[in-house]
Amino acid sequence: MLTIPQEYTTKCESAGTVSTLSYGEKSLLLYSPIEPSDRILYLIHGGSGDQHSFFCPEFLNMVDHMIDNGVLEPLYIVSPCFYDPAEKDKTPSSSGIAVKKFCKELREQIIPSVEGYIGVSFSRKTRAISGFSMGGVTTWYAFLQALDLFYWFLPLSGDCWVCGETGGGKYPEKTATELVSAVSRQGSPDFRIHVITGSKDIAFPNLDAQIKAMEKYPAVFGEKLNYEVLEGGVHDYETIFRYLFNAMPVLFSKPEIQA
């Protein structure tokens, strides 16, 4: 896996802009590239975080340099928060409840607000969702509930909790069958899942067990599922930025995909 060039940590002269968008009682952050784009990534923070967790200089500078150097096609990046504004309990159990219901908010409020603001009607083949840790759990819930909205799924160091907290590790076979059923229930559309974690990540045992169970269903997942493990990779944002540096250029890269 490639490392992020040191110069990508510095401010880029050709930088995109970050806007704050409000909807209801909440707000989110939107990164807009200099040039208009028909591609958009919804990027979800980890447990105890918020919409600012990803949008730090380290990440934004990296994205700016990637686009400026032609490593990454221009894209919009949306950073929402899955917690309610008054939520004080951000334990894993409480966070699990928050992310389970977040997909409804994503569908009914966030996507219409963001894409209405941009003024572009994105299709599922140009719409991706990703997240770190609990954001990864959120990404799996989107797969379970919103295959009509997204084609690209990039869960980072977070397993699927459809069978309960850390269910990917506790109940890998049942989790896999739930994911299979979700594909069928939603009309068996085409999709791509790119899963990344690290060998020393606390999420590795749960996610690894889940992916191995999913690989037993090649007719459903097969080449649509890509799984990477970074040797020595740990559970922090610095490592996740490296995953995104490697994975984002691959998003939206297959011209043969169908809506």
Model-derived regions, located:
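Non-catalytic cap/lid and distal C-terminal segments of serine-dependent acyl enzymes
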Residues: 1-259
